[in-house]
From Swiss-Prot:
Residues 2-56 form the ClpX-type ZB domain. Component of the ClpX-ClpP complex. Forms a hexameric ring that, in the presence of ATP, binds to fourteen ClpP subunits assembled into a disk-like structure with a central cavity, resembling the structure of eukaryotic proteasomes. The keyword Transmembrane helix does not apply. This is ATP-dependent Clp protease ATP-binding subunit ClpX. GO terms for biological process: cell division; proteolysis involved in protein catabolic process. ATP-dependent specificity component of the Clp protease. It directs the protease to specific substrates. Can perform chaperone functions in the absence of ClpP. Keywords: ATP-binding, Chaperone, Metal-binding, Nucleotide-binding, Zinc. GO terms for cellular component: HslUV protease complex. The gene is clpX. SMART domains: AAA, ClpB_D2-small, zf-C4_ClpX. Belongs to the ClpX chaperone family. ATP binds at residues 120-127. GO terms for molecular function: ATP binding; ATP hydrolysis activity; ATP-dependent protein folding chaperone; protein dimerization activity; unfolded protein binding; zinc ion binding. The keyword Transcription does not apply.
């Protein structure tokens, strides 16, 4: 290109690559006798990203962990739920093996292994999905089924889920197509009765219908980054058949549906098996016997259930399991708060009786593992507020009375004679 820059002031500068003037672009970057505009920089970045995409699949082919390795990794972060972890490990392994080898093997078409997690609040459904995504280093996004509506109604369109997934990987379509989507509260979109209604159920059966193609596999058209700012740009085409969908819900009352089916099978009249109250199965035992017909009676449509072939049930966490969750996983709650206090140069000790009290409180609230953090946060709030302004504190001790609200944490100072409770 000829030199379009002139020495006199007020003369235009031009991009050395596309020839646009400084008034036609937002930014013109100067180098030794050359200039490049922001549009050409963006184009260069796109070219580099495309090159990286072509190399990435070859790296990924050797990175798929075995079901045993997936299960072991889940054990590091999730307490209990052994059967659910095994089911998830196999389903996830099969899904990514299918992606690596194409949708067919020796002429046999391989179906998607989308997953349905059934279990009470705070049992670890979301944590399992998040942990899997971290292990596999794939994009992960969550959606709340209760906010979804059919296209054309007020609410969140189901295809917004794919947009969120794209945002997590900087709109890299290839990465998004290897991602995991977790849809929570899926039980809340059950239809209101067993019989289809002539009236529209835009937040129930209608959403199930809208999710069908997305979960099974379709090419979703998603606005590019910037969306409405650049209407002339073509929509991104995302193949959802390669995305793993995990749906989760508490399904309150499903155990009763299963119990009715199981008990009906025991017979009536003189030949009936009479069961004592003590023989009744627990909620967890009943959920483990779930069949597609139970989910249909609960309010999920048959087509939707068919798109979620892998079903894993999670048990309500016991008090012992909650205590384990507090101290054993790699990112256990007590370890997180101890790390926070260490940043202040202070040790934090949770006595065993304190852990028992935290677990008991969570059990009473029926919040499962999800409620543990709020209990610990409330117990430590005043201490975390005062500690940065205090001097010579070496250790903070939490016992049962602190969790119960009867006393303040014990503060241990550097000088033995200065030991005192912060509440004194």
């Amino acid at each position: 290109m000829t030199d379009k820059r002139k020495d006199g002031s007020g003369k235009l500068l031009y991009c050395s690559f596309c020839g646009k003037s400084q008034h036609e672009v937002r930014k013109l970057i100067a180098g030794p006798s050359v200039y490049i505009c922001d549009e050409c920089v963006d184009l260069c970045n796109d070219i580099i990203r495309e090159e990286i995409k072509e190399v990435a699949p070859h790296r990924e082919r050797s990175a798929l962990p075995t079901p045993h390795e997936i299960r072991n990794h889940l054990d590091d972060y999730v307490i209990g739920q052994e059967q659910a972890k095994k089911v998830l490990a196999v389903a996830v392994y099969n899904h990514y093996k299918r992606l690596r080898n194409g949708d067919t093997s020796n002429g046999v078409e391989l179906g998607k292994s989308n997953i349905l997690l059934i279990g009470p609040t705070g049992s670890g459904k979301t944590l399992l999905a998040e942990t899997l995504a971290r292990l596999l280093d794939v994009p992960f996004t969550m959606a709340d089924a209760t906010t979804l509506t059919e296209a054309g109604y007020v609410g969140e369109d189901v295809e917004n889920i794919i947009q969120k997934l794209l945002q997590k990987c900087d709109y890299d379509v290839q990465k998004a197509q290897r991602g995991i989507v977790y849809i929570d509260e899926i039980d809340k979109i059950s239809r209101k009765s067993d019989n289809p209604s002539i009236t529209r159920d835009v937040s129930g059966e209608g959403v199930q219908q809208a999710l069908l193609k997305l979960i099974e596999g379709t090419v979703a058209a998603v606005p590019p980054q910037g969306g409405r700012k650049h209407p002339q740009q073509e929509f991104l085409q995302v193949d959802t058949s390669k995305i793993l969908f995990i749906c989760g819900g508490a399904f309150a009352g499903l155990d009763k549906v299963i119990a009715n089916r199981v008990e009906t099978g025991s017979g009536i009249g003189f030949g009936a098996t009479v069961k004592a109250k003590s023989d009744k199965a627990s909620e967890g035992e009943l959920l483990a016997q779930v069949e597609p017909e139970d989910l249909i009676k609960f309010g999920l449509i048959p087509e939707f259930i068919g798109r979620l072939p892998v079903v894993a049930t999670l048990n309500e966490l016991s008090e012992e399991a909650l205590i384990q969750i507090l101290k054993e996983p790699k990112n256990a709650l007590t370890k997180q708060y101890q790390a926070l206090f260490n940043l202040e140069g202070v040790d934090l000790e949770f006595r065993d009786e304190a852990l028992d009290a935290i677990a008991k409180k969570a059990m009473a609230r029926k919040t499962g593992a999800r409620g543990l953090r709020s209990i610990v946060e409330a117990a430590l709030l005043d201490t975390m507020y005062d500690l940065p302004s205090m001097e010579d504190v070496e250790k903070v001790v939490i016992d049962e009375s602190v969790i119960g609200g009867q006393s303040k944490p014990l503060l241990i100072y550097g000088k033995p004679e200065a030991q005192q409770a912060s509440g004194e």
